[in-house]
Regions:
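Alpha/propeptide regions of enzymes that mature by internal proteolysis
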Residues: 1-347
């Protein structure tokens, strides 16, 4: 697997400072794990974002979502939008495996709640997806509960990117896409906060691919000469997951994650008809206890004008995360013989 990230090519996105790993896991407590299925017919998997180590159902996280273009099948967003809370890990997989992964998260959380003596009669798993059928026999639905458990068990801070987990079969801007991540740190009132982004990139058309103002897609098309013309439409979807330790409300968090679209546009996406562009975000502070014993819960939130730095940071992190998903992915040959090249050979 190619481990070179965008920064390893001497390319820097923006000017804001990154976290130590420049990944979503720079937010304290957040870990990420993958399970991958790779054989002659399948390039697919599941990626799980673990927001914390403790029981999320017992102490829910403030969360929000925003759908830029709704050509997608993500599960769990209705309740996230209504209540502003997240109560399970976030899983990413392929489109037709959403149901099986959803069921696996229910089982995993039911076991956790039973072990912690926490009553659970209903739960809202969040599962995002991209259609990886260009490289994966998607109707086979090869991802099962064991893969979800494998991804959770593998969750760590310094996780792999590229064609792994939920990114094993994705195609981004006509090249091999995958999982990518980045982070930015901001200072407010003398305290440092982190915003991290993880993407599952499966969107865009080659012609529009832009790397820090360089029209790389057009260069690639020119170098290919007589090769077949690339797919002209921006379709296929991208999942964007934001984590932060900022003290914000779910409404403020929604304002922040909307700015992921800025980073996406900087890479050349115009959010086409067939692209499901979905953003999910959570903060690790302002937790909400489950049950009806607490009538009043005190929380701290930033003033609105303070969010300006967060808007800028999330745009930079998303842009870099998309480019890292491309840089870290190796070329893959589809079952029908089509080759989806790695961007690394053109940088």
């Amino acid at each position: 697997m190619n481990r070179k990230r965008l920064s390893d090519y001497g390319i820097r996105v923006g000017c804001m400072p990154t976290g130590p790993l420049d990944k979503i896991t720079d937010v304290p407590g957040v870990t990420v794990g993958h399970a991958t299925v790779r054989d002659a017919r399948h390039h697919t998997g599941v990626t799980v974002i673990m927001p914390c180590e403790d029981n999320m159902f017992a102490k829910k996280l403030t969360a929000a979502s925003f759908v830029l273009n709704g050509f997608g099948k993500t599960a769990g967003l209705v309740q996230v939008d209504e209540l502003g809370m997240l109560e399970t890990p976030i899983a990413l997989t392929n489109t037709l495996n959403v149901g099986l992964v959803h069921d696996a998260l229910v089982t995993v959380m039911a076991e956790r709640c039973a072990a912690d003596h926490v009553a659970m009669h209903s739960i809202n798993p969040v599962v995002g997806e991209c259609n990886d059928s260009q490289l994966n026999a998607i109707v086979d639905r090869p991802i099962h509960e064991a893969h979800v458990r494998e991804a959770i068990a593998a969750a760590c801070r310094d996780f792999d990117e590229g064609d792994i987990g939920a990114g094993a079969g994705t195609v981004c801007h006509g090249l091999k896409g995958g999982i990518g991540s980045a982070s930015r740190q901001i200072e407010i009132a003398g305290k440092t906060y982190t915003l991290g982004v993880l993407v599952q990139s499966n969107h865009g058309c080659l012609e529009e691919l832009t790397v820090c103002n360089r029209r790389l897609g057009e260069e690639i098309i020119a170098k290919r000469n007589a090769r077949p013309a690339p797919e002209p439409n921006d379709r296929g979807s991208i999942m964007m997951v934001t984590a932060t330790d900022l003290p914000v409300s779910d409404r403020q968090l929604r304002r922040i994650i909307k700015r992921c679209s800025v980073g996406l546009a900087r890479c050349g996406s115009y959010f086409g008809h067939g692209s499901g562009d979905v953003m999910i975000g959570f903060t690790t502070v302002n937790r909400m206890p489950a049950g009806g014993m607490h009538r009043v819960v005190a929380q701290q939130v930033l003033t609105e004008h303070t969010l300006e730095l967060a808007f800028r940071a999330i745009a930079e992190a998303t842009q870099e995360a998309v480019l890292n998903s491309l840089c870290c992915a190796d070329a893959v040959t589809a079952e029908d013989g089509r080759v989806f090249e790695s961007i690394s050979q053109y940088l």
